[in-house]
From Swiss-Prot:
One of its GO terms (molecular function) is rRNA binding. It is found in: Plastid, Chloroplast. Belongs to the universal ribosomal protein uL23 family. This is Large ribosomal subunit protein uL23cz/uL23cy. Binds to 23S rRNA. The lineage of its organism: Eukaryota, Viridiplantae, Streptophyta, Embryophyta, Tracheophyta. GO terms for cellular component: chloroplast; ribonucleoprotein complex; ribosome. The gene is rpl23-A.
C-alpha cells in the first residue's frame, strides 16, 4: 500500500460513506490503475469509479509543497470497507 497515505475523515467524506464512496489521500505520483488495484487487493472490494483532485499546496518561503492528491472511490453495491465504517462510528 505504498500509494495510499490514509483515509480522510471530514464532514463530506462521512456523507459519502452512505453512498458507498470512500475518500483517501494518495501519493501524487500514483496512477489511477495502481490505486484501484491496491484498494481491490487490500480491502477485497470491487471499485467501479474513481474521482481525483489535487489539493492546493501550502505556500512556503522556497515554493509550494504538495505531496498528495485526494481520491473518492466508489464501490460496487454490496461491497463496503468495514474497518473505515467502524472508525467513523
Amino acid at each position: 500500500m505504498d500509494g495510499i497515505k490514509y483515509a480522510v475523515v471530514t464532514d463530506k467524506s462521512l456523507r459519502l460513506v452512505s453512498k458507498n464512496q470512500y475518500t483517501f489521500n494518495v501519493e501524487s505520483g500514483s496512477t489511477r490503475t495502481e490505486i484501484k488495484s491496491w484498494v481491490e487487493l487490500f480491502f477485497g472490494v470491487k471499485v467501479i469509479a474513481m474521482n481525483s483532485h489535487r489539493l492546493p499546496g501550502k505556500r512556503r518561503r522556497m515554493g509550494h509543497t504538495m505531496h498528495y492528491r485526494r481520491m473518492i472511490i466508489t464501490l460496487q453495491p454490496g461491497y463496503s470497507i468495514p474497518s473505515l465504517i467502524n472508525l467513523i462510528i
